């Protein structure tokens, strides 16, 4: 796999997520996929994403940084969304929040086999704290 192939595959994967093309997910995710060290397989991966989109109807994956060193991808994804209810243990309850996810992927046979994800929960906590104090949402953002 060349360095030019991997970014293209990854961008197509993100387009698949944003289109909610769950039947097409198998083109990008390995049947034995692992997420943060736990084997969830393609079906578990799909269930996780479907649940995320159900809980966050306006979820959109925005690539802000993409680095490829085959067979790995490192990406910083940006989100600006309104989760229903509790998100990451926080009572968001439909408020609009912005946060990033730093995520690393390992590809096998041109499909995602391993994912390591870290979400900036502190950014969400700061926004919720500022919102509860009456600050404008723009003041609560920690990053552009």
What are these model-derived regions, one by one?
Residues 1-144:
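C-terminal and inter-domain tail/linker signature
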């Amino acid at each position: 796999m060349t360095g030019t192939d991997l970014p293209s595959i990854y961008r197509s994967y993100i387009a698949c997520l944003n289109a909610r093309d769950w039947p097409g997910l198998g083109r990008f995710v390995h049947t034995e996929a692992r997420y943060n060290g736990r084997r969830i397989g393609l079906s578990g991966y799909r269930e996780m994403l479907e649940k995320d989109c159900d809980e966050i109807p306006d979820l959109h994956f925005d690539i802000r940084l993409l680095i490829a060193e085959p067979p790995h991808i490192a990406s910083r994804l940006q989100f600006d969304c309104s989760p229903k209810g509790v998100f990451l243990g926080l009572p968001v309850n439909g408020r609009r929040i912005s946060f990033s996810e730093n995520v690393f992927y390992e590809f096998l046979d041109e499909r995602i086999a391993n994912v390591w994800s870290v979400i900036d929960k502190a950014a969400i906590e700061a926004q919720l704290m500022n919102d509860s104090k009456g600050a404008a949402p723009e003041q609560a953002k920690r990053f552009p």
